């Protein structure tokens, strides 16, 4: 079964807190507080959240399937139970989803660009992540991160974001896993399983060799299954659309 990695659970400040252990992201570690100044998360009701990535002082990227009418965007956050002095909340001023996206196919062109209602300032815990200058290479070591479930049963959620390293696979592995591979998509994971993104990590970044290469879209259910990588929207393939929208061409179509 395929899982779109949005969750419908308790508010992040109310979820069961997982003590630091070997079961994080799934299978990673607590992120260093200085590792993720670009990482944001959003509430779009009292019960749902997704990850996001700050790409400049006024714009964030996430998955299109995370879109809801009301969204509250948190930046500069680390521990849900402790406030950083520089954390801020923003709301969408404008939201852009590919106009040529297939309406009934959630995984098609699963990317959304959001303009914040007010720019943010760079600070100790807030700074953008640059868009990629080159596409990623198969075999690259990639970093995943988020506040999503840290157990495959999706009954434990963390107070802090967790990080893990996974590998970028070739298209053969991806097609074997799911009998196909959507266009402009990357797949990444660990062949033996045990390390993966999970529910609540949707929309968060895939960072390969230091570059923002993917946006988490979907994966296996349960998470972290052997030979069942997760799928990420390939950011590099959408650069012309992203740059056109930011430049003011609001009717730009996706490739």
Swiss-Prot record:
<keyword id="KW-0865">Zymogen</keyword>
<feature type="active site" description="Charge relay system">
    <location>
        <position position="202"/>
    </location>
</feature>
<keyword id="KW-1204">Blood coagulation cascade activating toxin</keyword>
<feature type="active site" description="Charge relay system">
    <location>
        <position position="65"/>
    </location>
</feature>
<keyword id="KW-0964">Secreted</keyword>
<comment type="subunit">
    <text>Monomer.</text>
</comment>
<dbReference type="GO" id="GO:0004252">
    <property type="term" value="F:serine-type endopeptidase activity"/>
</dbReference>
<feature type="disulfide bond">
    <location>
        <begin position="142"/>
        <end position="208"/>
    </location>
</feature>
<dbReference type="InterPro" id="IPR001314">
    <property type="entry name" value="Peptidase_S1A"/>
</dbReference>
<comment type="function">
    <text>Thrombin-like snake venom serine protease. Cleaves Arg-Gly bonds in fibrinogen alpha chains (FGA).</text>
</comment>
<keyword id="KW-0582">Pharmaceutical</keyword>
<keyword id="KW-1199">Hemostasis impairing toxin</keyword>
<feature type="disulfide bond">
    <location>
        <begin position="31"/>
        <end position="163"/>
    </location>
</feature>
<dbReference type="Pfam" id="PF00089">
    <property type="entry name" value="Trypsin"/>
</dbReference>
<dbReference type="InterPro" id="IPR009003">
    <property type="entry name" value="Peptidase_S1_PA"/>
</dbReference>
<feature type="site" description="Required for specificity">
    <location>
        <position position="196"/>
    </location>
</feature>
<comment type="similarity">
    <text>Belongs to the peptidase S1 family. Snake venom subfamily.</text>
</comment>
<feature type="active site" description="Charge relay system">
    <location>
        <position position="110"/>
    </location>
</feature>
<keyword id="KW-0378">Hydrolase</keyword>
<keyword id="KW-1015">Disulfide bond</keyword>
<keyword id="KW-0732">Signal</keyword>
<dbReference type="InterPro" id="IPR043504">
    <property type="entry name" value="Peptidase_S1_PA_chymotrypsin"/>
</dbReference>
<feature type="disulfide bond">
    <location>
        <begin position="50"/>
        <end position="66"/>
    </location>
</feature>
<feature type="disulfide bond">
    <location>
        <begin position="98"/>
        <end position="254"/>
    </location>
</feature>
<dbReference type="GO" id="GO:0090729">
    <property type="term" value="F:toxin activity"/>
</dbReference>
<dbReference type="GO" id="GO:0030141">
    <property type="term" value="C:secretory granule"/>
</dbReference>
<feature type="glycosylation site" description="N-linked (GlcNAc...) asparagine">
    <location>
        <position position="249"/>
    </location>
</feature>
<feature type="propeptide">
    <location>
        <begin position="19"/>
        <end position="24"/>
    </location>
</feature>
<protein>
    <recommendedName>
        <fullName>Thrombin-like enzyme batroxobin</fullName>
        <ecNumber>3.4.21.74</ecNumber>
    </recommendedName>
</protein>
<feature type="glycosylation site" description="N-linked (GlcNAc...) asparagine">
    <location>
        <position position="170"/>
    </location>
</feature>
<dbReference type="InterPro" id="IPR018114">
    <property type="entry name" value="TRYPSIN_HIS"/>
</dbReference>
<feature type="domain" description="Peptidase S1">
    <location>
        <begin position="25"/>
        <end position="247"/>
    </location>
</feature>
<dbReference type="GO" id="GO:0006508">
    <property type="term" value="P:proteolysis"/>
</dbReference>
<keyword id="KW-0645">Protease</keyword>
<dbReference type="InterPro" id="IPR033116">
    <property type="entry name" value="TRYPSIN_SER"/>
</dbReference>
<feature type="disulfide bond">
    <location>
        <begin position="174"/>
        <end position="187"/>
    </location>
</feature>
<feature type="signal peptide">
    <location>
        <begin position="1"/>
        <end position="18"/>
    </location>
</feature>
<keyword id="KW-0720">Serine protease</keyword>
<keyword id="KW-0325">Glycoprotein</keyword>
<dbReference type="InterPro" id="IPR001254">
    <property type="entry name" value="Trypsin_dom"/>
</dbReference>
<dbReference type="GO" id="GO:0005576">
    <property type="term" value="C:extracellular region"/>
</dbReference>
<feature type="disulfide bond">
    <location>
        <begin position="198"/>
        <end position="223"/>
    </location>
</feature>
